[in-house]
Amino acid sequence: MKKILILLMILWAFALVACGGGAEIEIRNYDIIDIINQQPVDEEVFYHNIPVDTNIDEPPHIPDPYIDLVEYEPIFTMQPLPDHIIRLIDGSSFHAEVPFGFDFLTYLTISHRDFEGNLQQGHMIVAEEIGKEVLEIFEEIFHANFPIERMRLIDFYNALDYYSMADNNSVAFNFRTIAGTNILSRHAFGMAIDINPIQNPYIRGDIIWPADGIEYIDRENIRPGMITPGCPVYTAFISRGWIWGGNWTSPRDYHHFERR
């Protein structure tokens, strides 16, 4: 059998020479024989017998982004509206009818926990005169581990309150009127804040905003993210003189707090 294999290899080599236009190939029969005679290797024994240098230090730990989640420090800061934010809101939530300048407002960076307990970084625009107080409120809410789904400027929703609510977004400044009236909302002056609209819907008769809030009209069935009398959100705002829309008779605006 070995002789047949050797003969086949030699014939194969000559065929390569013929196809290659006369190129010379050295045939080393002993190499072919050695390959044929080679015994299969027991890989377990082979690798087990490799000498190991025990003086090599352990490699440094490289964080796995899918396993080693980084927990950042919470942030609660205020600053004048940055240029890129002015460009974002100009002509959107802040338009020609606004009776004050950009310096009337302040830009907040606020850390909060989402419904999975993850640390998130949100942003709000409020009146500059209450900026520090709002930061204190949300820092208190943060340390109480009250979940807030998201916190984005209304301009990411084309300044349309309904779409922001449908996305369960918590928001403050938006120069607009009170729904169904010509009266300016406290949101128009950066003096009102809405939190978790789905868990805390606006209810007026048969009207429920946002629509998904229908699951939370039973205020006795308390679930995460709901604002109720005595909860951390309620206490943080009410203790500082804010008014809660959930205490109104009609409408009941459970997600709404305002400063007067």
Locate predicted features.
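Hydrophobic helical h-region of N-terminal Sec-dependent signal peptides
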Residues: 6-14
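N-terminal module-boundary/linker segments of secreted carbohydrate-active enzymes
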Residues: 25-118
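Conserved short secondary-structure elements within globular domains
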Residues: 149, 156-183, 236-243
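Positively charged n-region of N-terminal signal peptides that target proteins for export
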Residues: 1-4
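C-terminal motif of bacterial Sec signal peptides marking the signal peptidase cleavage site
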Residues: 17-18
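Catalytic cores and adjacent binding grooves of peptidoglycan-active enzymes
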Residues: 29-36, 42-53, 178-184, 189-260
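Active-site acidic/histidine clusters and adjacent loop/turn architecture
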Residues: 100-165
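Second-shell loop/turn segments in exported
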Residues: 96, 119-128, 181, 218-225
